[in-house]
Curated annotation (Swiss-Prot):
Positions of the Cytochrome b5 heme-binding domain: 1-80
Cellular component annotations (GO), alphabetically ordered: membrane
Originating organism: Caenorhabditis elegans
Signal peptide: none
This protein's name: Delta(5) fatty acid desaturase fat-4
Amino acid sequence: MVLREQEHEPFFIKIDGKWCQIDDAVLRSHPGGSAITTYKNMDATTVFHTFHTGSKEAYQWLTELKKECPTQEPEIPDIKDDPIKGIDDVNMGTFNISEKRSAQINKSFTDLRMRVRAEGLMDGSPLFYIRKILETIFTILFAFYLQYHTYYLPSAILMGVAWQQLGWLIHEFAHHQLFKNRYYNDLASYFVGNFLQGFSSGGWKEQHNVHHAATNVVGRDGDLDLVPFYATVAEHLNNYSQDSWVMTLFRWQHVHWTFMLPFLRLSWLLQSIIFVSQMPTHYYDYYRNTAIYEQVGLSLHWAWSLGQLYFLPDWSTRIMFFLVSHLVGGFLLSHVVTFNHYSVEKFALSSNIMSNYACLQIMTTRNMRPGRFIDWLWGGLNYQIEHHLFPTMPRHNLNTVMPLVKEFAAANGLPYMVDDYFTGFWLEIEQFRNIANVAAKLTKKIA
């Protein structure tokens, strides 16, 4: 959950061949928050239809918006940059697909999207999600049982497992994967997210929808912005003087990256508290209107979570339990969510990759090899390519759509990246090492 500052100036987006103006009133009322800003002055046709599958409210909103479309095509400024070779192009991919071929890929993906929907793969199974919720609740209750019988370390580890599995559930409900009525998905996300997990549903959406809309696009995807601790692209180094202590961190980031993974949950807990505390005055109407639900849910989470610590025998046990449960949960989450995108190239906004949604998702995502245990442990995110192409598709259908996605990629000459964990993790480390080498090169100039 890496939240970024947003610009709120009016802009245009193109949907179904029409340029629609997004003014302050429209932007504030957007239920998806900042995700709409990622396609500022761009064609958002495919991403709109992909993100809003089955949403009557979204299409009613679009119909009203199209009534106000300007009759003349607006002037859209070109996006240009001047990268320095050997520095700004490190870890950066290129998008060299012609407009004609890009249009063919877009049409092919639309056909795939229609086929997937016709085959019922966008429909969630209530029984599946009831089972997954009960699994996590029973895991927590068993951890309570172990704690009661003084098996404190196993109890803490089991709580960490529960934290991770709850992470997948808030992710799925925040993506509206089960209910067609999005209000019910929101309620479910408050329960598994705010109350059980301690993560803000709204904070998750605000960050994660932006990430999905502009995956690995520099300046758009907030997940790439890990400064001052890590730099995923050389552009991030420009924010610091060459003799800064931050540059020293960057020089060795590939070494200490692994050691920071367990702290992800603690970071997200803190960011959730900050986000929820600011919701009553948030720019977007949706977050202001749902602030009370999230505040109550998060307050109840910390009430029972701190109550669990209270019943431990002494402070040393409490500290051990807190750290073990949250660090285990943090590592189990982070070793998944960092694998899929940090191990692949990033793209400049000027690369034009955002003009083709399918290419964007396939070229910026790596799958983990599937298996029954991995499917459970990773919450289906080992099928990350499929998930990014169809974010509202329920977890239990991702393995079914995988052959269709492979077929689509092969037919359109697109890569389909899938590796075992250690191969993907090493590629992730290499990406951080590449930027570390750039930081070392820059700091040597002043030595």
